[in-house]
Amino acid sequence: MPDGWRMGKVSEIIELHDSKRIPLSGQQREKMKKIYPYYGATSLMDYVDNYIFDGIYLLLGEDGTVINSEGYPILQYVEGKFWVNNHAHILTGKNGFSVEMLYSLFSLTNVKDKVTGAVQQKISQGNLTSIDIIIPSLEFCIKFNELIQPIFSQIRSNRKENENLTSLRDTLLPKLMNGEIEVDSIQI
């Protein structure tokens, strides 16, 4: 192992924000304006009229489908203002670990042996935080973050552009279909 690196536990590199989660029923969500993303264990489930979190976070499935067929955790790299139900762990990094570093780490960490539940899979907080990992030096974390931040910044930028293009399509397509806008009259 390189100098300054050591064995440790996931608990040493993550901040858990699970205590802030508030589940909403489908009936509650139906009555809300669709403004902010509402995430579940594995995906975006809906939109709601308020948010709990604002920033960049890593969501790791807690119960339900929590791992893929190879045993790696289901991860969601999320940003902005959003709400999370109680089926996903909400993580940020600490001790030199960025959210992007956590994403990279968990993408390569098989957690199959940490999953419990015969009927419904679950990765408990205790099992998550007890995962053995190699913790690199702070200097390595800084250098690694310098390398990956531009990549994740581009990912976030591409997502925003996709959202804008989707919104534009959803606005223009109905107008094209009902004749409100004619393609012949558009100058390029």
Q: Which role fits each region the language model picked out?
A:
Residues 1-23, 28-40, 134-183:
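Non-catalytic DNA-recognition/assembly elements of restriction-modification systems
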